[in-house]
Amino acid sequence: MDPPTPDPTRLSEGGWTLSREEAETVYESLGVSVTAHTVVYEDADLRERIVEAGGEDRVWRFFFASRLDITPSPGFGMVSAARPYVVRESKETFADELRDRGFEDVAHGDTETVRIEGFRARMTPHRARLSVDGTDVRILGAVVVWHDGDFHVAGGAYPASGLEALVDVDADAYETELLELIRAVA
């Protein structure tokens, strides 16, 4: 099974570059195995602008998309039973990813139902903080889970404020683009 393929035109026009592609077993117990096939992209243009302005060289904005390979494949009735577990684990894994990237005070908001290409999806917003040279950078993001025959998990994070001394950030535009990228995975 391959990872999902986000719209390559949208990615290149937005300055996104592939930073990682992997297949990782995320769960294995009681005869069930779950492998996440994932691609991760970063906003290389934003990173370059921040470095040129004297800021830290790091990933500031990222987007990921995963397709879950569940073996044995859950039957029709089992998808509904598995969905809450997949949503819960995806929220926690995304929060751990933010912490691994050095973000602090990671918290998630209430999960809500949204539509992704006609499929019911569960979206959970996240927020965090990144301390850079004595300044707090506010980070916002989201993780979305849906099932269209396969379980998909997609999301990302972006700076919402705190970088104004280096570059202009447009949190509303970043949020809009993140949601468009997620929808383009379907």
Predicted regions, residues:
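Surface-exposed amphipathic alpha-helical segments
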Residues: 154-186
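Extended hydrophobic
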Residues: 136-161
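Short Lys/Arg-enriched alpha/beta "domain-start" segment
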Residues: 11-12, 81-86, 90-99
